Amino acid sequence: LFIELDALEVCAKALRFFSINRFNVLSFHERDHGDGAGDLNGWVRTHLKRAGFVADGPIFIQCYPRLWGYVFNPLSVYYCYTNDGTLEAILHEVSNTFGDRHTYLLPVSPAAEAGPIHQSCAKKLFVSPFNPVDHRYDFKVHPPGERYAIGIREFDCEGEVLVATFDGHRQVLSN
């Protein structure tokens, strides 16, 4: 699912089998993301402003929707734009099977906006018993377009220990 946070209700009204914050064949629940309190758009904008970003443009989320009420989003990606259309930051929200979440808010260099975008950060959340927290993530993101791709490489002090990728092509969600 790739959707603008300001357009959630509009999309739900237009689609028979898609709902926001209630059960349906496909649904998006704001409590599945962010701090779980409900106002996801406000939560992301507050997060951005606290980190010194402008946060005045559209915010899109790339994630899995609930399917018949069930979902697991190991990674949700928020694309945060300014009013002039500049991709300012990407918020990577990592979840584990225990229901814990951690966000990695990373700036996007104007030179990298055309893609692919490379970002790195220290790992902060226990995700797997096979990979401890003292690792580093490298994200490689192709900006949203007709094609969507993201790669995550995890490193320890000796080198690469995990590679995960997702690659897809945009399809319009319809009835």
Enumerate the language-model features and the residues they cover.
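Mature, function-bearing regions of proteins
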Residues: 1-175
